[in-house]
Amino acid sequence: MGAVELSNAQARRVALGAQGFNDRRPTGRVDRRHLRRVVDRMGLIQIDSVNVLVRSQELPLFARLGAHPRTLIDDATRHGDLFEFWVHEACHVPIELYPLQRWAMREHPRWTSLRSWADANERLVAGVLDRVRSDGPIVASDLEMRDRPKGTWWDWDDGKLALEHLFRTGDVAARRRPNDFARLYDLAERVIPADVRTAPAPAAHDAKKELLVRAARHH
């Protein structure tokens, strides 16, 4: 089959259709099954702190589902349908993709400065992991490690840095309270279903190839 030329308008319609905008909205009660169909169409749901109307991650659901319980994403995470991880950004991801992200947890490729900090603060990181093990789930403010006034932007203290490092390595996983942007950190074994967490993980090259194919399918 030869190359197919599309106008800009046609290409936009193809992309919007692939993302589920051609599908009918549900007419009855919206539940986790409807959320799952949306995620299967989109591939993932990006998380963002922007909060003009609601948190940005809620808007794609409203655009495709209309009125729905605002706890849908949290419910899906609690039931093991989704997990949170850094993909291109922080995202809610279908749980079956967890093995495809294990290479990123092993290699920690995008956050070299955070990895270097963790290497230089091994005892602190280990202590934070012990705290999560004994008291989790916790939020970063539970650690009370800030020794200076909070500055601009994120300005993470040592406790938050340790939690984020452990989150990226897969030692801890995250949930969120309904309508609350703060991450709740807990041991991965208490968040990720055991059969998913222990499933064979493909090599980095194979995982990246499969993720690329899936990304193309959603567009």
Regions found by a protein language model. Give the residues of each.
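Long, low-complexity intrinsically disordered regions
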Residues: 1-219
